[in-house]
Design a protein with these regions (language model features):
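N-terminal subdomain of nucleotide-sugar transferases
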Residues: 1-57, 367, 374, 378, ...
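Carbohydrate-associated surface elements
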Residues: 41, 161, 181
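A short helix/loop element that forms part of the nucleotide-sugar donor recognition site in Leloir-type
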Residues: 188-201
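Nucleotide-activated donor-binding/catalytic signature segment of Leloir-type glycosyltransferases, i.e.
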Residues: 252-270
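Short alpha-helical donor nucleotide-sugar binding micro-motif in glycosyltransferases
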Residues: 269, 277-283
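Aromatic "clamp/platform" in nucleotide-sugar-dependent glycosyltransferases that forms part
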Residues: 291
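Short hydrophobic beta-strand element within catalytic cores of glycosyltransferases
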Residues: 308-311
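Conserved acidic donor-binding segment of nucleotide-sugar-dependent glycosyltransferases
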Residues: 323-335, 343-349
């Protein structure tokens, strides 16, 4: 089987979608499934060594220098001239130009098409279109989602809570819950001491970590305010924020306004295969409070290094932050959260606690998830072939 992935984002753009695509493609290859990836070009990026990654000329995105948008003409030519006879199934990963191009391509060439719902737009659209009232933005996001989910044969949701949210919208397309899982590189033990030396962080000061996109929807404002409260109890604490994004300037100003800038370090993106494991290993507590995660892989990445996690449990993260995980799950309230961080710092040296966290992360190994994805593809392909031969009714075209 050969599967076409279509995505509006991929590396060097760092986010959860890029990570998910790379992880699944690597594991699917081990299982004998070939994938082709069509994604935008990024100016100045190094050429891909992998010939199965097909870059399409792109343009900029207003007010978003990190992202690119496909140019329609080149995208259509790539799909129709290079790929029409080469794929058995189309898998869409983003809801922008990639979605409409992927659906059109699949229909024109008689191919089954599925999509992964990676991004929960409802709660952060207003950050990027601030003139839009939040109530109207949510209505638009829901209608947009409902329409797109009806375009495909089946959907993949990274978590059960995300599936429940989609079904509450009125989505009737079948939804398979299938997390990405952690790739093997996440379990390579990091060198925390090396990371502290690299970034001139004292070895004896407790270190809080946030890793991820520095974006408004990640609710890092709350983490900074919580940290200001924590410093009253633990004035020796440091907070490292690893990542980049549109909220960086705002958060830098906020740290100054709170008077905590000397204890907060913004260090940018880290290399996933070298520096990032070391970063997690250096931490005494990983803190997270995003309200919009469809899964929350960074929580598992931290656990894989045995780093204590303190997090709210919103949307997709609820699937990870179970009672067995060993994580501290707290409400989005500064005092309660900071108290949990104090407790996590006390338990950070506990070897049994770290072992519990690692064991939980290991239960999310990505190869097992890839096997489930292969079964999903086979199921969808079989149902589609039955529809084509008239032995099974098409729920999309019939309106069921």
């Amino acid at each position: 089987m050969r599967v076409l992935f279509v995505s509006d984002v991929y590396f060097p753009r760092v986010n959860g979608v890029s990570t998910s695509i790379r992880t699944f493609r690597s594991d699917l290859a081990q299982l004998g499934i070939e994938t082709l990836l069509v994604t935008p070009e990024y100016p100045g990026a190094a050429a891909d060594a992998d010939p199965s990654i097909i870059r399409v000329p792109s343009g900029g995105v207003p007010r978003d220098p990190e992202d690119r948008r496909f140019l329609g003409g080149p995208l259509k030519r790539v799909l129709n001239r290079e790929l029409a006879a080469k794929v058995d199934l189309v898998h869409i990963h983003t809801p922008f130009i990639a979605h409409y191009a992927g659906v059109r391509f699949a229909r024109e060439h008689g191919l089954p098409v599925v999509a992964t719902y990676h991004t929960f737009f409802e709660d952060y659209l207003h950050h990027y279109v601030p003139i839009l009232p939040r109530r109207i933005g949510r209505w638009i996001a829901r209608r947009f989602t409902l329409s797109q989910c009806g375009d495909v044969a089946e959907l993949i949701s990274p978590s059960a809570p995300m599936r429940e949210a989609l079904q509450a919208y009125g989505v009737t397309t079948p939804i398979e819950v299938l997390p990405t899982g952690l790739g093997a590189e996440s379990f390579i033990r990091g060198d925390g001491a090396k990371f502290r030396r690299q970034f001139d962080l004292p070895p004896d000061r407790p270190l809080l970590l946030y890793v991820g996109r520095v974006a408004f929807e990640k609710n890092i404002d709350f983490l900074l305010r919580m940290f200001a409260r924590l410093l009253i109890r633990r004035p020796d604490a440091l907070f490292v924020i690893a990542g980049e994004g549109p909220a960086l300037a705002h958060l830098t100003r906020l740290s100054r306004e709170l008077g905590i800038q000397a204890a907060v370090r913004f260090i940018g993106y880290l290399d996933r295969r070298t520096d990032l494991p070391n970063c997690y290993a250096a931490g005494d507590a990983f803190v997270f409070a995003s309200r919009t995660e469809t899964q929350g892989l960074v929580l598992l990445e931290a656990m894989a290094q045995g780093t204590p996690v303190v997090s709210t449990a919103e949307l997709g993260t609820r699937s990870i932050l179970t009672a067995e995980s060993g994580a501290f799950v707290v409400p989005e309230e500064e005092e309660a959260f900071s108290a949990a961080v104090v407790q996590a710092l006390k338990l950070a040296p506990d070897a049994s606690r770290r072992a519990q966290l690692r064991a939980h992360a290991e239960s999310w190994a990505s190869l097992a998830m890839a096997r489930r994805l292969v079964s999903f593809y086979e199921k969808v392909s079989l149902a589609y072939s039955q529809i084509r031969t008239g032995s099974l009714r098409d729920p999309v075209s019939s309106g069921a």
